């Protein structure tokens, strides 16, 4: 889908660039596949702010997405492509031959009327799902599981994908968008193709209000605060903060490594931080 630019008849339209969604379905989502979504405003169950700068935004309903794709060898037809306010990718409504409806992540080049199927030996075409052990090396994939049966966790954002680059002792070797290479069990399912809406990275909101509509409030810099509010606060006139960057609670940030999950280090063959040769 193309990008839309606007004549600047208001200041907020001068820089505005959005994705043209005219080809998507205009109506409401399937009611049986949605539920209400209550606003948290960045608060936890005690009412305290645990994530700053969140709140407000347009009301949403949550669409249940089938990330597991375990309805094996049942052909489904794409009824329509829809917008989903809860993610950057578009979603596709699938009607299976037994009458069941489901939402899946829409890959690129998936069109209304196309047929998709999940199984152990199915064609390698966009929207089909199969175990990594059944895919040819070099396949572009998305919605990749990390644990068999848990549902896809990798490559779910707009325009993202992973590539199957090899196999080793029942494990699949994947190259991710970040440059990381990692091992994943060959029994894990993945869907073929790259995720839809690749132009998402080119949009320009044009005004602060569009972030507010999404529930994002103004992100205040620490150096603009008072000393009581942030370690970088205070000082006469503008200052640099006077120390290495820290969080409001004094922990180092901006480049400080935070990964502590040593248990899965052995599955990462090449770190995303490794210098490109």
From Swiss-Prot:
GO terms for cellular component: large ribosomal subunit. One of its GO terms (biological process) is cytoplasmic translation. Gene3D superfamilies: 2.30.30.30, Nucleic acid-binding proteins, Ribosomal protein L2, domain 3. Keywords: Ribonucleoprotein, Ribosomal protein, RNA-binding, rRNA-binding. It holds the Pfam family Ribosomal_L2. Residues 222-277 are annotated as: Disordered. GO terms for molecular function: rRNA binding; structural constituent of ribosome; transferase activity. Belongs to the universal ribosomal protein uL2 family. One of the primary rRNA binding proteins. Required for association of the 30S and 50S subunits to form the 70S ribosome, for tRNA binding and peptide bond formation. It has been suggested to have peptidyltransferase activity; this is somewhat controversial. Makes several contacts with the 16S rRNA in the 70S ribosome. Part of the 50S ribosomal subunit. Forms a bridge to the 30S subunit in the 70S ribosome. This is Large ribosomal subunit protein uL2.
């Amino acid at each position: 889908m193309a990008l839309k630019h606007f004549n600047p008849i208001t200041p907020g339209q001068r820089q505005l660039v959005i994705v043209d969604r005219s080809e998507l379905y205009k109506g409401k989502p399937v009611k049986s596949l949605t539920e209400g979504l209550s606003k948290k405003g960045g608060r936890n169950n005690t009412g305290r702010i645990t994530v700053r700068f969140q709140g407000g935004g347009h009301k949403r309903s949550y669409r249940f997405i089938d990330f597991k794709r375990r309805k094996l060898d049942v052909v489904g037809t794409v009824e329509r492509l829809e917008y989903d306010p809860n993610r950057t990718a578009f979603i596709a409504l699938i009607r299976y031959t037994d009458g069941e409806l489901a939402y899946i992540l829409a890959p690129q080049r998936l069109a209304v009327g196309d047929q998709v199927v999940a199984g152990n030996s199915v064609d390698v075409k966009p929207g089909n799902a199969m175990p990594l052990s059944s895919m040819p090396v070099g396949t572009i994939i998305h919605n990749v599981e990390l644990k068999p049966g848990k549902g896809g966790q990798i490559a779910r954002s707009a325009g993202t994908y992973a590539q199957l680059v090899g196999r080793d002792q029942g494990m699949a070797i994947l190259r991710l968008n970040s440059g990381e290479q990692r091992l994943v069990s060959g029994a894990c399912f993945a869907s073929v193709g790259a995720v839809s809406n690749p132009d998402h990275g080119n949009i320009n909101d044009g005004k602060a209000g569009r972030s507010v509509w999404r529930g994002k409030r103004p992100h205040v810099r620490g150096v603009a605060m008072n000393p009581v509010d942030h370690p970088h606060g205070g000082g006469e006139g503008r200052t640099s903060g006077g120390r290495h960057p820290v969080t409001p609670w004094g922990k180092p940030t901006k480049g400080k490594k935070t990964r502590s999950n040593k248990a899965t280090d052995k599955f990462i063959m090449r770190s995303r931080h490794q210098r490109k040769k």
